[in-house]
Amino acid sequence: MPIQKCKPTSPGRRFVEKVVHSHLHKGKPFAALVEAKKRTGGRNNNGHITTRHVGGGHKQHYRLVDFKRNKDGIPAVVERIEYDPNRTAHIALLKYADGERRYIIAPKGLRAGDKVQSGNDAPIRPGNCLPLRNMPIGSTLHNVELKIGKGAQLARSAGTSVQLLGRDGSYAIVRLRSGEMRKIHVECRAVIGEVSNQENNLRSLGKAGASRWRGVRPTVRGMAMNPVDHPHGGGEGRNKGIQPVSPWGQKAKGYKTRTNKRTTKMIIRDRRVK
């Protein structure tokens, strides 16, 4: 899709670059698949900030997206491709042969009128969902499960994908965009193709207010704070005085924070190894 630059009619418009998507639905979402979404402002039930840089933003409705794709053997037709404010990828509204409608993450190239299917015998084409044991080696996949039947957890954001490298017994070996190689059970499901809206990283918001519309608050450097607020704060001139740490003193560079030792054995190649 083309990248459109705005005329500099104001300072806020000067640096705006947006992606034009002429194929997206211009109306409201399908009402039965929409839920209310309450904003937390990054606070927990005690009112304490648990996630920094979150707050404000435009009201949004949550679209109920089907990540399990468990309607096997029932073909579906894509009614339309829609914008979803809750994610970077676009979503597709499917109408199944039995009349049910569901949203899915739209893969690259999927358009209204296309047919998609789920199940062991689904043909190998973008948008179809089937187990990893039935995928051709070298396939580009997205919406990959980590646990059988739990629903997709990997490669769900705009332009992402994983590659199926091979199979070893009851496990498939995949390579993620980060460079990590890991084993996933062959009965876990995935969808053929890569996620839509791959130009998302080329856009430029142009002004701070565009981030505020999205519920993102400013990020202040620790060096610009006082010593009471951050370990990097204070000092004469620009001086950290210590190695980079978080506001709570945890090392910020090179320190591994992974605690799920149970699944570490599934990782063949770490994403940090270059």
Curated annotation (Swiss-Prot):
Biased composition (Basic and acidic residues): 229-239
GO CC field: large ribosomal subunit
Residue ranges of the region described as Disordered: 222-256
Pfam families according to UniProt: Ribosomal_L2 (PF00181), Ribosomal_L2_C (PF03947)
Domain of life: Bacteria
GO molecular function: rRNA binding; structural constituent of ribosome; transferase activity
Keyword terms, alphabetized: Ribonucleoprotein, Ribosomal protein, RNA-binding, rRNA-binding
BP-aspect Gene Ontology terms: cytoplasmic translation
Subunit note: Part of the 50S ribosomal subunit. Forms a bridge to the 30S subunit in the 70S ribosome.
UniProt record similarity statement: Belongs to the universal ribosomal protein uL2 family.
Function as written in the Swiss-Prot or TrEMBL entry: One of the primary rRNA binding proteins. Required for association of the 30S and 50S subunits to form the 70S ribosome, for tRNA binding and peptide bond formation. It has been suggested to have peptidyltransferase activity; this is somewhat controversial. Makes several contacts with the 16S rRNA in the 70S ribosome.
The protein, known as: Large ribosomal subunit protein uL2
Species for this entry: Acinetobacter baylyi (strain ATCC 33305 / BD413 / ADP1)
